[in-house]
Amino acid sequence: SYDAAALVELLHTATLVHDDVVDDANERRGFFSVNALWKNKIAVLVGDYMLSRILLLSLEKENTDLLKVVARAVREMSEGELLQLEKARHLDITEEIYFEVIRKKTASLIATCCEAGAISVGNTQYQECMFLFGEAVGIAFQIKDDIFDYGSDNKIGKPTGIDIREQKMTLPLIYTINNVSQKDRSELLNIVRNKNEDASSIARAVDLVI
């Protein structure tokens, strides 16, 4: 179980380091991100080093079953990130695509954590059940986190409106665009496309969504 926990935590940390590079984020949980301190080149190498530790630890412990599910999670998260980046260019993400993105980007990691727990104690008969449980938890977590981005900075404890700045089409924005007047829809899309760096425009978009 300790080996499984180490593997998934190394994976989690590596993905956070790489995510901060992709998102050009300078903070992570109230502290400077790796790329903010040592630039993108070092951050990418740090993330890669952690992934290499997963491979070595798995081989040293002969945990090929754990390595298989961790490798699958890396593939899923990478595909999810690429899908989100590709769709962000055209702002044409549907609810169906949104759920596919968060299933791959977020839920696959939590699903792998749960599945790895079952594998580590030899309960392979519960492996699929634990995976599906973790996937459901991951999807719920990401939806809640996306809703928080349209809340109040003071209540949430972190900056809001980040998804608009990064042109991320999350569920609150997708739902609003599909259910408002043509005028408000055009205004929202214009803000996301052209005014996503302007604080007052972002505040206006948040108001339209909530």
For the regions a language model picked out, list residue spans one by one:
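All-alpha prenyltransferase/terpene-synthase fold signal
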Residues: 1-210
